[in-house]
Amino acid sequence: MSMKQLNRNFPWCDEHENDSFTGILKEKCAWSDEEYFKLEDELYDLSSKYNDADQLPRIMVWRLMRVFSYVMMTIGCHFNPNDGYKIENLDDEQLFDRRERFQLVFEGFFKGEMPKTKCFEYGRSNRE
């Protein structure tokens, strides 16, 4: 299974792209729903693939953790008035909804139980 979206969002590999979700977040100070859902879809696919695995490939775990920590740190910077970084295209309530979904999807991946997307306030609900 490909890790194309994960690699696009991981700055320390050749496949990284500035027009990925994390690239846009960094370079344009904007949250791209379109790019986020590409990454999320891949997390659901990878979760299905590794559902019965006792161990996950280290390179995949490192890249997932780095993407997670970068995005959560960036959201923290947005809410820190002394930081100077602001996600320009969302108000605080929109960002809270996106942060919640992002966090629960990543936590669900590591737990091995992906959340049902119909429970989220924001975004698509195409997964039961």
What is each stretch, according to the model?
Residues 9, 24, 42, 98-101, ...:
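Charge-rich, solvent-exposed alpha-helical interaction surfaces
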Residues 67-128:
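Amphipathic alpha-helical binding modules
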Residues 16, 34, 38-41, 55, ...:
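Alpha-helix boundary/N-cap detector
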Residues 7-9, 58, 62-69:
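Short helix/strand-capping turn motifs
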Residues 1-40:
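Short terminal alpha-helical segments
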Residues 45-61:
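Short, solvent-exposed, charged loop/turn and helix-capping segments
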